[in-house]
Structure formats: structure tokens, C-alpha cells
Design a protein with these regions (language model features):
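Generic structural hydrophobic/aromatic packing signal, biased to beta-strands
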Residues: 24, 46, 53, 107, ...
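C-terminal, helix-dominated tail/subdomain
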Residues: 91-171
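Aromatic-lined, polymer-binding surfaces characteristic
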Residues: 1-116, 123-124
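Extended glycan-interaction surfaces of carbohydrate-active proteins
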Residues: 1-7, 30-56, 132-168, 198-203, ...
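Catalytic and substrate-binding regions of extracellular carbohydrate-active enzymes
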Residues: 156-280
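Well-ordered alpha-helical scaffold segments within catalytic/enzyme domains
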Residues: 20-36, 74-91, 134-140, 144, ...
Length: 280
């Protein structure tokens, strides 16, 4: 796959690189004893290229594609690190990539007191449990990054039980059992009230309290609409107060409905249809 005509993902700087390299490496190491040459080639290509995708975490752990795609891309990145360490005994420095050690704080920072995400870029505002947060909390001894995570996990499991397993569960959810460690009952919150991410798609997040459910929270976004999953929403913001989201981001719009109208989302030329659609 590294040399086919569909190899654009190999040097991708977005979540494609994390997802594809993470999945291929997990598969390659699973057959290491039978296909050592293929496994070696796959790992080599991954280590040479996945750092391009991981560069987006710099400098403070934010993610330009928003919280929803953070969970998607970062889950495969954590899995990649996990399989490398499990099989080969090292992650070859991937976990030391600039900003990666801080990215476990990002979902908590990007979530308002309403328990909704600041859903800039192409994602929804709903918060679901993210198993990789247990990995980050254990790895970097920051159990305050798990704010509300156990409660969200309990609610999801209760919903699943009530629906007899019909819920749309995260495929990585079972890994939470491997990554959970016993931490302080209620760890002291070391997260800031005011934070800005830096980077090419900067965001700023401000809140009046971490413990008051009626606290005021505002999130601002800057950057360029040409960013991966970027929308024509530069300068957008969300506002929470008294447990209610008063100012919202419209969130994602399905690709099919747009493309069925004959509009081309993937052309980045000056006069492309892409720049005439607010949410894509």
C-alpha cells in the first residue's frame, strides 16, 4: 500500500496518517513471526511518516480538526504506541513528540460546563467517553484529565444495557479496561481557567470555574478555513452559562447532501465550491 497510486495517506499531515499507520502497524506486528520482512517494512514506513500527523499537537496539545477528530486520530496513535511498546519494547520516541504529552488535557479544556464540546471544525458537540483518556491519565499521572469521564462511561454502559446492546459503542471501548488505573478519588484540578493553544489553528478557552455547573465558558477559534476539516467559521465562538449553551457552532454537515448537488468539496482552488459552503 505504500507504493500504490492511492498512497496519499502515507505522508498525510492529518488524521489519515494516524489511522492508517496505526492500523497497518497493529496488523503487521500481529503477523510478525510469519511475515517478518513485511512487518519490518510497515514499521519503518510508519516511524518515518506518522510524525507528520503528530506535528499538529505542538505546541500545547490542541488538535486542529476539533475534539471529535481528536478522539478518532489520537485513538489510533495511542494504539500505535501501545503495540510498538508491547511487541518491540519501545515506541521509538513517538510519545515524546512536541505537544503529545499535553494532549490528554485537550478534551477537558474543550468541554464546557454544559458537558458539550466546543465543536469547531467538522464535528459534533456531544461528549462520549474516550478510552484513550485513561491511557493519558496513567501515562502522565494526570488523573484530573479524567474529569467526568467515569460518569460518562457509566451512563453509556447503562444506556447500552437498557437497549440490549444496540448502542453505537466505540470500537476502542474495551481497551479502557487495560488502561484504567486506580487514581485519587477526586484529584485536585490542575487545569487552567484560561488557556490558548497556539499553533496554526489556535483556539482560546476561558471559564469562570471548574467546579460550578453554572459557570461561564467561552471558546474562540482562529486559523484558516483551508485546514483539515476546517469550516468557514474562523472567528466563531461558543458560550455556556447557567448550564446552557447559548451560542453554538453549527457543527458538521453530511458530505453526501452537498456532493449530490454537484458541488466539489475537495477542490481547494481559489474559486472552488468549498469556499462557498459555511460548514465545510
Amino acid at each position: 500500500p505504500f507504493n500504490s497510486r492511492h498512497k496519499g495517506w502515507v505522508r498525510s499531515a492529518n488524521n489519515w496518517g494516524q489511522v492508517c499507520h496505526g492500523g497497518l502497524t497493529a496488523g503487521a506486528l500481529a503477523v510478525l513471526e510469519d511475515e517478518p520482512e513485511l512487518a519490518a517494512q510497515t514499521v519503518h514506513n510508519t516511524l518515518r511518516n506518522v510524525t507528520r500527523s503528530m506535528a499538529v499537537y505542538a505546541p500545547r496539545g490542541s488538535y486542529p480538526e476539533g475534539p471529535a477528530y481528536w478522539s478518532y486520530g489520537t485513538s489510533y496513535n495511542v494504539m500505535l504506541i501501545g503495540v510498538l511498546e508491547s511487541v518491540l519494547g519501545t515506541d521509538y520516541g513517538l510519545s515524546m513528540a512536541p505537544g503529545f504529552s499535553m494532549t490528554g488535557q485537550y478534551p477537558a479544556l474543550a468541554g464546557g460546563p454544559s458537558d458539550l464540546f466546543f465543536n469547531y471544525a467538522d464535528g459534533g458537540s456531544s461528549r462520549n467517553p474516550s478510552p484513550i483518556l485513561f491511557w493519558f491519565a496513567s501515562r502522565f499521572n494526570r488523573f484530573d484529565w479524567l474529569r467526568g469521564e467515569r460518569q460518562r462511561l457509566s451512563e453509556l454502559l447503562a444506556t447500552t444495557e437498557a437497549s440490549r446492546g444496540a448502542s453505537n459503542l466505540d470500537r476502542f471501548l474495551p481497551l479502557a479496561l487495560l488502561w484504567m488505573k486506580t487514581g485519587p478519588g477526586k484529584p485536585e484540578c490542575a487545569l487552567p481557567l484560561h488557556w490558548q493553544s497556539g499553533g496554526e489553528t489556535p483556539i482560546a478557552l476561558h471559564r469562570s470555574s471548574w467546579d460550578d455547573p453554572a459557570a461561564t465558558f467561552v471558546g474562540f477559534k482562529a486559523g484558516s478555513p483551508s485546514a483539515n476539516h476546517g469550516q468557514m467559521d474562523i472567528g466563531s465562538f461558543v458560550l455556556d452559562a447557567n448550564g446552557v449553551r447559548w451560542a453554538v457552532d453549527l457543527g458538521a454537515e453530511g458530505y453526501h447532501g452537498i456532493e449530490s448537488r454537484g458541488m466539489n468539496l475537495w477542490n481547494r482552488a481559489q474559486n472552488s465550491d468549498r469556499w462557498t459552503i459555511f460548514r465545510q
